[in-house]
Amino acid sequence: MPALNSKKFYITTTLPYVNAKAHIGHALEFTRADIIARYKKLEGFDVFFNTGADEHGIKIYKKAQEEGKEPQAYVDEYAAKLKNVLKMLGISSDVNFIRTTDQKHIKSAQEFWKLCEKNGYIYKKNYKIKYCIGCELEKSDSELINACCPEHPNLQIENIDEENYFFKFSAFEEKLLKFYEENPKFVIPDFRFNEIKAFVKRGLVDFSISRLK
């Protein structure tokens, strides 16, 4: 047990989509994170090690349809498979496994939304884009080849025209740059920190955070 006054250490993997089976890339990420978590525990840190499953998105909905299952039943099945992968890999038994359909996650997301809205960081506007379901990203005409995404040529590009909520990401550009300057060791290694700073300096763009469909 860590001492009550021990330093806290938080580490999380990305949360894999459950639209397909786990693969070697997931195993590598889980194992790397577990190694770091175990090492920090040995150093006396109070470690919170997090992983889980991202269960929202058009890809997952369509995959559930393909298999003739209700979306919730589909994600329940694949989340269980993902937990079995963690067990098979010998990942730390105290890892926190969060699902984006968990009530505690939903409640936290709602509270975060309300906080952002209260502070003026959420607004509505019309949203008209070309969207690749495979990438789950907006695509410009210059990124398409024969009106198709080069990475997912068998998937039809969807034209979305609807009113969406947007997050005012642009409001944080100067605040982040100032924070980075005042906290030069916030991200390690340095070359990754430089990539982050360069990204912010290029200009942050507001982005959609909702879907009607």
Question: What is each residue range found by the language model?
Answer:
Residues K63-D76:
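A charged helix-plus-loop insertion that forms the helical arch/lid used to bind
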Residues A53-K59:
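Short, charge-patterned binding micro-sites
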Residues V75-D94:
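A glycine-rich helix N-cap at a beta->alpha junction
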Residues D46, E70, S92, I122:
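Residue-level detector of anion-binding/catalytic polar loops
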Residues N119-E173, L177:
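Cys/His-rich short segments
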Residues K41, K87, E117:
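Anion (oxyanion) recognition and catalysis
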Residues T101-Y121, Y131:
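Feature captures the FAD/FMN-dependent oxidoreductase FAD-binding
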Residues P2-T51, R99, K104-S108, E158-K213:
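Structured secondary-structure scaffolds
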